[in-house]
């Protein structure tokens, strides 16, 4: 939770905004809207520990819980109208309706093998972004490679059948399943697989009907 994080890191609360679903903050140059999220699903369920683990690296520590019941999503809109959606968590049934018709220029979306690609693709259709950049997916293979027991703990038998090749989690098969789902459900959106340690510049473009976009 934010209180545990601020206490642990000894962060001044002067510039900390504790946000909840439905909040909206207007600043001089940006507007931020908050949408409630979920991070409480895996194959065996998620349960709060009876007591917190003192080891801050543990998933059962107060910090390791990562605010699973407090997860929030953010739509950030600049004064020029350009907008970015930051989304993480799980594709629970409420999410597509919470985020319906936001139409951000850029959607930075959490990919997880615990999600179903078609459910994810449908959510993207409801959101209606121009460009999708996935995040989180690149930590999945290192996590499973370092702790294989999590494959059974976090994934269903069907998910393991799709994404495990020769006993190892296959990141390419995983990401491709979601890219294909986006192409099927929301062909107007483009999913970019960006590389680590590179800068990318995005700009606006226009196009007359039947012509190529002009910068």
Predicted regions and their residues:
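Active-site neighborhood of phospho(di)ester-bond hydrolases with catalytic His/Asp-centered motifs
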Residues: 1, 18, 85-90, 106-112, ...
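Binuclear metal-ion centers of metallo-dependent hydrolases, dominated by the metallo-beta-lactamase
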Residues: 5-24, 121, 125-215
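Core dinuclear metal-dependent hydrolase active-site scaffold
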Residues: 19-102, 196-215
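A conditional alpha-helix N-cap/helix-loop micro-motif detector
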Residues: 67, 113-114, 171
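A short, acidic, amphipathic alpha-helical segment used as a generic capping/interface helix at domain edges
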Residues: 94, 115-121
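Local beta-strand N-terminus motif with an aromatic residue
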Residues: 103-104, 129
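Glycine-rich nucleotide phosphate-binding loop and flanking beta-alpha elements
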Residues: 114-115, 140
């Amino acid at each position: 939770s934010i209180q545990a994080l601020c206490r642990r890191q000894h962060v001044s609360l002067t510039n900390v905004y504790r946000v909840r679903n439905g909040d909206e903050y207007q600043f001089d140059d940006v507007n931020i809207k908050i949408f409630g999220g979920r991070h409480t699903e895996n194959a065996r369920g998620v349960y709060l520990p009876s007591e917190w683990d003192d080891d801050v690296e543990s998933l059962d520590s107060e910090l390791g819980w990562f605010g699973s019941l407090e997860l929030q999503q953010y739509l950030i809109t600049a004064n020029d109208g350009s907008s970015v959606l930051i989304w993480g968590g799980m594709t629970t049934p409420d999410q597509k309706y919470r985020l319906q018709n936001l139409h951000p220029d850029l959607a930075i979306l959490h990919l997880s093998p615990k999600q179903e690609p078609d459910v994810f693709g449908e959510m993207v259709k409801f959101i209606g972004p121009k460009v999708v950049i996935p995040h989180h997916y690149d930590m999945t293979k290192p996590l499973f490679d370092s702790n294989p027991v999590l494959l059974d703990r976090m994934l269903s038998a069907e998910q393991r059948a799709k994404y495990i090749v020769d006993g190892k989690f296959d990141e390419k098969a995983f990401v491709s399943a979601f890219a294909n789902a986006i192409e099927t459900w929301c062909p107007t959106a483009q999913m970019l697989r960006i590389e680590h340690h590179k800068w990318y510049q995005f700009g606006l473009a226009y196009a007359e009907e039947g012509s190529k976009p002009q910068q």
